[in-house]
Amino acid sequence: MSTTDTIVAQATPPGRGGVGILRVSGRAASEVAHAVLGKLPKPRYADYLPFKDVDGSTLDQGIALYFPGPNSFTGEDVLELQGHGGPVILDLLLKRILALPGLRIARPGEFSERAFLNDKLDLAQAEAIADLIDASSEQAARSAVNSLQGAFSARIHQLVEALTHLRIYVEAAIDFPDEEIDFLSDGKIEGQLNGVMADLEQVRTEARQGSLLREGMKVVIAGRPNAGKSSLLNALAGREAAIVTDIAGTTRDVLREHIHIDGMPLHIIDTAGLREANDEVERIGIERAWNEIEQADRVLFMVDGTTTDATEPAAIWPEFMARLPATLPITVVRNKADITGETLGLTEVNGHSLIRLSARTGEGIDLLRDHLKQSMGFTSNTEGGFLARRRHLQALETAARHLIQGHEQLVSAYAGELLAEELRLAQQSLSEITGEFSSDDLLGRIFSSFCIGK
């Protein structure tokens, strides 16, 4: 479809409502205004007018707003018709507009895509629109607004600018090798490179927290039957989400709860007790449990404190630990402290976190909540923070890898050409975040996930 067509779509959710909005963008927006309104409204002023059908009869009446390009959201001429929110009325008005020559229904996200293509916002800001709509907490919404206002993009532009200056310096050293000063070995380039690498690492840290706010942390509760996994799920969820009995193997399928801890979204997953299955249904449940464990951001290894005094995971259940992915973070949760009399608290044991609590009474649950926040580097202070997507994290990781490789070339061989190439690749990876170097396929995937009227 052509990006020069004039597009129209409903900008409010489908269904009944007090107000329904149709948005038109493109060179024929003024023609739509003359046909439906009988006049072109004064730019950026609200005008209360009847909306006319082709025969002159009134379909509805409401507010019309006209924004001539480039001073509009999309950078094109934009007309918004704000009428009553009945689906029949909106459908009649939409059909009236589509009957005009050169008009078509907008693709999902096409208004935002045109804003991007017309340099009204960059790709990270465009994605922030969708993230703001989908925000599941106040902090996620505030961070999405920061991204929309350019907080994330500004950090990326600073890094790109620093890399540009560094590339100029490196390439000058390559082009003028006969100068008395060896620019590659005098330490100045390495100092600048180290500074950029440190700044990039700080942005990566903030982006990881932004991704956490957007997507949530996946925490899987795993362990033997009757260790208290479902009781812990209920305690974290604050409700009876799972059935709890003294019968081993009560939980046979995966149970999911979505909760927030101080604005941080968590996906808590309760799984079937791990043991040799007694029947086919239990076997399937245990297989699903392992699938969830392998995809987790963190595992809460639930231990019945009345059955063992051990605190090291390998000593508690070596076969379980042997099957876990080596890089998967684990927190050992010694449950039933109300029975064993153990002191509630969090400690570190040989690189693993250990927490003593009682899922039945709720004692120690607040300690676990704080631990989950801290383990993911989450802080309650997100003022100035931004949201990030997985593609952003991947681009930042790629850029960091190129800078590390460039640093190795510099300190080991003073290989200016190789360093310059690594700097260029790092710069390109960063520019993909804001859309300065992005394939049409990537843009299509991003904007297709938006609402129709966005």
Curated annotation (Swiss-Prot):
Locations listed in the record: Cytoplasm
GO biological process, one term: tRNA wobble uridine modification
Keyword Oxidoreductase among UniProt keywords: no
GO cellular component: cytosol
UniProt keyword list: Cytoplasm, GTP-binding, Hydrolase, Magnesium, Metal-binding, Nucleotide-binding, Potassium, tRNA processing
Family assignment from sequence similarity: Belongs to the TRAFAC class TrmE-Era-EngA-EngB-Septin-like GTPase superfamily. TrmE GTPase family.
Name of the protein: tRNA modification GTPase MnmE
UniProt lineage: Bacteria, Pseudomonadati, Pseudomonadota, Gammaproteobacteria, Enterobacterales
Gene: mnmE
